[in-house]
Every structure is written in C-alpha cells, then in structure tokens.
Amino acid sequence: MPLTVVGGLPAAGKTSVCREILRLRAEVQPQSQPPTWLRIDTIEQALRDSGEMLPSMPGGAGYYVAAAVARDVLASGGEVLVECVNPLPLTRRLWEETASAAGARFLSVELICSNAAEHRRRAQQRVSDIKGLELPGWQEITRRDYAPWPEADLRLDTSRLTAAEAARAIIGLHPADGTR
C-alpha cells in the first residue's frame, strides 16, 4: 500500500473507511509502521486557520501540500494513505505523478454511496472531527464539481458495504506484504 488514495464525494464514507484500513493494518501487523494518513480536510483547515487560505478559496493548495508530504514519506520508505474528494482529473493525475516519481505502487479508490437517501442522511447527521471545519450540506454536495472516475482501480459502494468490508477490499488489493 505505498500510496493509496481514497476519494469520493463528501459523506461517502472516506474517513470511516480510512480509519478501518488503519485499524485492520494494526491488527494484522501490530509491529509494523502504519501508513501515514493524509487528510486533505485537515490540511486545508490548517491552511485556513493560518490565514494562508481564505474560506472562500477553492481547495487545491491542500492537495499540493499533501503530495509534497507524501513524496517525503515515500522517499523514506513509508506508506501513505490519502483521504480526499479527488474530484477532477487534475487532482487524480497529481497522485499518479507523486507515486511514479517515488517509484511507489499506486492504488486509486473511489467510494460512492449509490443510495441517495442514505447519502443525504449521512451528510445531514455527520459531525466534523476537525476543529473549525464546516462540513458541506447536502445541496453543496450534490452541486459539487465532481468528474466521473472510471479509471479508478477500485470503485466501492458504501451503501452496500460496511466500512470494514470496504477497507478489507482495499487492503486485499494492496496488502502490506506486497502480495496480491
């Protein structure tokens, strides 16, 4: 799992799935170093808190910061797990280029929630665990600029899978020992 990117619209289940990936990895390999988890929301909120990114500015800086950190982690032999919306071909290419430059294996994962009522319920009921981060409402999510991602290595529907099942599918494609 040297560089795994988990993307999808807000409230699709990215945070829950990433937490499960880390939990399962720790369970299976308690002595190994876990992947470095880079959350674009955390990075972009820190940039807003610092005044370097205005609340009205479109996200983008967070992706470049995360890619730079990912390059350093990969160069030191570490693994990286990125959680981001990853809405456009531009952001998706950034991760491919980051992995390629580091000579790292790359896995792209798109999470979807095909049940609109469930997706809406999640969006309305979730609470941010990032201080200061205002989560988008359902209307913002449905109006978001998000391009289809047919080239993702794995596309998982979180309305049909639990977070643990999705995490197992991801780990199964990119196990820690490099086997498949």
Located regions from the model:
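Hydrophobic anchor at the beta1->P-loop junction of P-loop NTPases
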Residues: V6
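Glycine-rich phosphate-binding loop used to anchor ATP phosphates in small-molecule kinases
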Residues: G60-F106
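Conserved substrate/cofactor phosphate-moiety recognition/catalytic segment
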Residues: T15-S76
